[in-house]
UniProtKB/Swiss-Prot annotation:
It comes from Mumps virus (strain RW) (MuV). GO terms for biological process: symbiont-mediated suppression of host NF-kappaB cascade. Plays a role in the inhibition of the host NF-kappa-B pathway. This inhibition occurs at the receptor level, by preventing the signaling of TNFR1 as well as IL-1R and TLR3. GO terms for cellular component: host cell plasma membrane; membrane; virion membrane. This is Small hydrophobic protein.
Amino acid sequence: MPAIQPPLYLTFLLLILLYRIITLYVWIILTITYKTSVRHAALHQRSFFRWSFDHSL
């Protein structure tokens, strides 16, 4: 049994590491896309409001 334990432990550690890397990667992508989308939306909204305001006057 002790001979089987180290590889299982290593694979378990590897899985945890892989899971952490994937979650971190996904989190980074989501935050980047969220920030850029929010920035773009704010810019578009601002320009649209300015355009409508200028044309209303």
